[in-house]
Amino acid sequence: IDKKVQRTKNRPLACNLISVKLALIYTSVLCSLAFLILIQFNILTIFLGFASMVLAFAYPFMKRITYWPQFFLGLTFNWGIVMAWAAITNNISYEILILYASAIFWTLGYDTIYGTQDVADDEIIGIKSTSIKFKNNIKLFVSFCYLASSALIIYLFYSKFGLNNFSLLVIIYILSLVYQVIIFEKNDPKKCLRAFKINNFSGLFLFFGIFLIN
């Protein structure tokens, strides 16, 4: 698939800079190292670690079978939130599930923006994405995702810390999402990429907003 998409055709595997065999060896080494790290934690975290592998190996195939691969990316990419909490507390609380859900909506939004760059190629080769499913109402869909993410974060902070301790950095996180919706245009790949890259800072604001209040 990467060979047929303008944005991804120069990736190492797609342009034969490395072989599939070498990629598999490299992946095996990384998985082995990850396993050695994983078994240092409690049983719950180890279980969650193995569960994450199911998501990680299933995700690359989602574009072939569903218009919601970005949702599966959200489940997979943010699984570390739950694992980190389990590693520290040896439990899974409702607060961390709220944070996980917020992160899923965030990922669903920003990866829909990212995928907009590839809509023309994706439609030709027959793969699916939320960027294609909602291409006629993409700003509305991304706005909904970001609104859901923001609402869950606000609820989490309010229930956990109260309004008096609400973090300015979390407000900046929310405003950065609003700014993305304003600037990206579905027919302008450069603006889509620019909006997507803002999420590097969005995540940083959210991290420090949570970290500093604790």
Feature roles, as predicted:
Residues 1-49, 105, 124-164:
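Multi-pass membrane catalytic core of lipid/isoprenoid biosynthesis enzymes
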Residues 2, 6, 110, 114-115, ...:
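Alpha-helical transmembrane segments and their lipid-water interface positions
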Residues 44, 108-124:
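Membrane-embedded alpha-helices of multi-pass transport/permease systems
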Residues 95-106, 162-169:
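Alpha-helical transmembrane segments
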